[in-house]
Amino acid sequence: MPRPRSATCWAAAAGRWSCRLLALLLLLLLPGPSGGSEITFELPDNAKQCFYEDITQGTKCTLEFQVITGGHYDVDCRLEDPDGKVLYKEMKKQYDSFTFTASKNGTYKFCFSNEFSTFTHKTVYFDFQVGEDPPLFPSENRVSALTQMESACVSIHEALKSVIDYQTHFRLREAQGRSRAEDLNTRVAYWSVGEALILLVVSIGQVFLLKSFFSDKRTTTTRVGS
């Protein structure tokens, strides 16, 4: 029995909407063009690590960093423009964020220094955002406003970006907390072993001291013949 024409048209329209929705969801999941660098690296003691980024004039940039493990969880940070002018400089910071607008074209340099530390190396995370993310649906060559579905996709996209940022910060906090807990656990273990050794030495000393109190002291008399 042939299907009614209205039912066929309805099924075709539903199929087109399903395909369009699937395409939009895939667009949300695809990684967009990267607008910065996000790196976690090891910084040895008495060491300095620098990174370079080409930036065009007028671009808004944000540098955010945090020390995850090592020592007092602090590091020196310095940011310079292409002419060597210092834009940002902080000493022994655990975490910080700095936003600036590039005043000229060229290669900008930012360095992390652990030269003040002699024994401990650090694990440093930084996120250097250059410019703003491009819109999900570019406005060029568009003759109509965003549809309700496209607006919903834009809202979902922004919410997912916020979720990613929150997850990153929570992972950093978890890693730093775990490092502090492991460091505290190591110190407690060493302190416990030291206390046990001290108690053992004191106990042995008390045993020998008490033994010396109750030991028989015999004196020998030597008779000298005339």
From Swiss-Prot:
Motif mapping: COPI vesicle coat-binding: 213-226
Superkingdom of origin: Eukaryota
Post-translational modification, as annotated: N-linked glycosylated in complex form containing terminal sialic acid.
InterPro entries with a match to the protein in the record: Emp24-like, GOLD_dom, GOLD_dom_sf
Lumenal side of membrane: 36-189
Glycosylation site residues: N105
Limits of the GOLD domain: 48-130
Subcellular localization(s) per the UniProt record: Endoplasmic reticulum membrane; Golgi apparatus, cis-Golgi network membrane; Endoplasmic reticulum-Golgi intermediate compartment membrane; Cytoplasmic vesicle, COPI-coated vesicle membrane
Keyword Membrane set for record: yes
Purpose of the protein: Potential role in vesicular protein trafficking, mainly in the early secretory pathway. Appears to play a role in the biosynthesis of secreted cargo including processing and post-translational modifications.
Originating species: Rattus norvegicus
Protein name stated in the entry: Transmembrane emp24 domain-containing protein 7
Biological process, per Gene Ontology: endoplasmic reticulum to Golgi vesicle-mediated transport; Golgi organization; intracellular protein transport
